[in-house]
From Swiss-Prot:
The lineage of its organism: Bacteria, Bacillati, Bacillota, Bacilli, Bacillales. It comes from Lysinibacillus sphaericus (strain C3-41). GO terms for biological process: translation. Disulfide bonds: none annotated. This is Small ribosomal subunit protein uS2. GO terms for molecular function: structural constituent of ribosome. The keyword Ribosomal protein applies. HAMAP family: Ribosomal_uS2_B. PROSITE patterns: RIBOSOMAL_S2_1, RIBOSOMAL_S2_2. Keywords: Ribonucleoprotein, Ribosomal protein. It holds the Pfam family Ribosomal_S2. Gene3D superfamilies: Glucose-6-phosphate isomerase like protein, domain 1 (3.40.50.10490), Helix hairpin bin (1.10.287.610).
Amino acid sequence: MSVISMKQLLEAGVHFGHQTRRWNPKMKKYIFVERNGIYIIDLQKTVKKLEEAYDFMRQVGQDGGKVLFVGTKKQAQEAIKDEAERSGNYYINQRWLGGTLTNFGTIQKRVARMKQIEKMEEEGTFEVLPKKEVIQLKKEHERLIKFLGGIRDMHDLPDVMFVVDPRKERIAVAEARKLNIPLVGIVDTNCDPDEIDYVIPANDDAIRAVKLLTAKMADALIESKQGEEEAPAVEAAAE
C-alpha cells in the first residue's frame, strides 16, 4: 500500500513549485511542466521519493534513532513543533542559532541555564529576589524557551535531521553535513537537491503541503515504535 495518494498531494498543493525565474536547474528532473510562469512538480516522483524517505525514517525509529525537525519559516513552524512532539523527537522552529550542532556543548550550556531558571522559580528563589532581577530572569527564560525549548531534552547530536526548505535553513544543513548527519528534506524547485540525502520534491510554501509531508515523517517514526510494542505481544501469544 502506498504511503500517500496522488489525491492527497494534489489537494494539499504539493505540486506547485516556484516561479520559473526562481529555480535551481538541479531540480529539473523533478519538474513535470511549466504553467503560467510556475513550475509544476512531478507528483509521481514525489510519491516515490516520499516512500524512500518514509522507509528510511521508519528504519531510523526501529534502530532507536532520534530526529531533529527543522523549519523556521512561518508556514512550517506549527507543523514542525506538532509533528516532532507527536513522534517524541526534537525541533527548532524559530531562528536557527549558529553552532546548534557544530558547537553543541555551548548550546547545552544555554539549555542548562534555561532549566536552572525554571528550578529557581520552582524552589521559590524568585520570591526573595528583587523584582527587577526576576523580570530579567523571566525575559531570559522566555528567549531561551523560544529558541531552544524544542531541544531541551536532546542530550546528544541527532541521528537524522528533517528540514523544510534547505535553502532557508542553509546554516542548519551545512552543520548537519559537516557532522555527517543524514538529511531528509522537503525540497522545492528553487533548492539544491544535492545537499539532501532523502529529497522530497514538493511545495515548501503551502502550510497544508508542509503539514502533510511532515506528518508522514512523524508517522514513519511512530509506526516503527508500534512495531516494537507489538513484537513482544506476538511472541507471548506464540508461546
